[in-house]
């Protein structure tokens, strides 16, 4: 079996296990019972079709088990492509007092400079990873302070003996999540000696298509999403963690399973025949 076929199969195994649990839950363990819904929420039932609440019943039981799906899939790709992957990996090292102060300074400037700059008639400061990191690393004075960072995903290239850390967020992360990730990444890059060879802010999928067109505003407060080399979006992330062809293997894995499970959901849960249009696919 080719490497990318192996990655696709491993990804599908993870998704299939999760989807089978969802289907077992909504069909057997906790099905939507119309009479129970009408008895518990008579006003809602009188105003809104039962089918709307049937769909929301499924959604609630789908989103909870899929909360950590991106991390699980990334670990599978890392294990198949690089040789080792793990979620919630703890990295412990030391960072000098001066570098920690500068990390705080950089983050505070990005968080609070808007209003002050406007009062002075100045342009807001734009995030620039390369210059920010250079500024932090140029001062290594003071005591070495113990620092612990928990990585969303950690991977090792077993052949090349290289270590990678990823702050992996959903494709549309909020501002607070992104700030925390940037602080963790700056600490990883500022450790002396370094405990990982590279660390990245990663989004597993780009709903805007190309990186140049990524326009979700919240992470852009902390990173230049189009230019910062520490940012990996979509195929950049999957190729880094799994090797060439991993992104297409991921896309193919999801779309193949999507056809199968959509048919089951229509017939077994909604009780209707699927439409001719199978719906959205990942691209």
Language model features: what each stretch is:
Residues 189-196:
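Arginine/glycine-rich "motif VI" loop of SF2 helicases in the C-terminal RecA-like domain
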Residues 202-283:
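Domain-level recognition of nuclease-like catalytic cores that cleave nucleotide substrates
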Residues 59-61, 135-141, 167-176:
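Surface-exposed cleft-lining segments at the edges of enzyme active sites
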Residues 78, 151-172:
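Conserved catalytic cores of phosphodiester-cleaving nucleases, focusing on short active-site segments
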Residues 172-183, 210-212:
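Active-site-adjacent loop/helix micro-motif of nuclease/hydrolase catalytic cores
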Residues 2-9, 17, 135-145, 154-156, ...:
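Extended alpha-helical scaffold and adjacent linker segments that couple domains
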Residues 1-95, 276-283:
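Nuclease-adjacent, charged terminal/linker segments that flank catalytic cores
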Residues 90-159:
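Active-site metal-binding core of divalent-cation-utilizing nuclease and nuclease-like domains
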